[in-house]
Amino acid sequence: DLGYMYGGGADAILKDIEVVNREMHQQLPDLPLILFGHSMGSLAVRAFARDHDDCMDMLIICGSPSKNTARPLGVALAHAESTVFGPTHRSHVIEALSFGGNVMRFRKDQNCTSWICANKAAAQEYSDSELCGFTFTDDGYLALFELMKRAYDVKHWHCTKPKMPVLFVSGADDPCMINVRHFAKAVQDMRHAGYLDVKGKLYPGMRHEILNETDKKRVYHDIAFYIRKKEIGRASCRERV
């Protein structure tokens, strides 16, 4: 069931990351591990890094939603709707509150998925796919909101690798970013969490799916260049995972 977390919430998502992390260490023990997360995944990898940064060597945060002050309202609505309609209820109210602003920002394009990508072909593929653009369940939204809470909860961050490279990349026209000030705040939050090597890069003209934009090769090249430049070694702590 797309958009349903079966009651596992954010903890289940983070457990999945832990399992994959462990498997990668076992299969490729001599290679460094780079944790890359896009969109909701960017919240998940930060929530995971909050307690397990010693089990990775670099963190790349792509297309990250900025901290939303309306999150508590979303949590309250999701809990209320879940109580009344059940956890599998698909909330069009929360969907409108969460993504309505994204759609309105590009309403002149007359396509409700234009905020996804400036590349019209990619945006159309998104619209045509049954695996994209589905409405989350209340259960799914609760997981999303919890991941956002943990990702930005720098006061409870357990930074054990202050020199670990952290890279933020986003489209300059990505509405999930809200604005440049919010993007800069997200970058600064990671510094406040204890990391010394945090960089942020915005791509003009690109929207949320920068990995699918017409000039996507530039994004791939920049990320690959960043990884090679850092010459990271493998994480020393494997047994915790």
Roles of regions detected by a PLM:
Residues 36-41, 45:
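Gly/Ala-rich beta-loop-alpha elbow adjacent to hydrolase catalytic centers
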Residues 14-31:
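Conserved acidic catalytic loop of the alpha/beta-hydrolase fold
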Residues 235-241:
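Conserved small/polar residues in nucleotide/adenosyl-binding loops
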Residues 175-185:
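Conserved alpha/beta-hydrolase "acid-adjacent" motif
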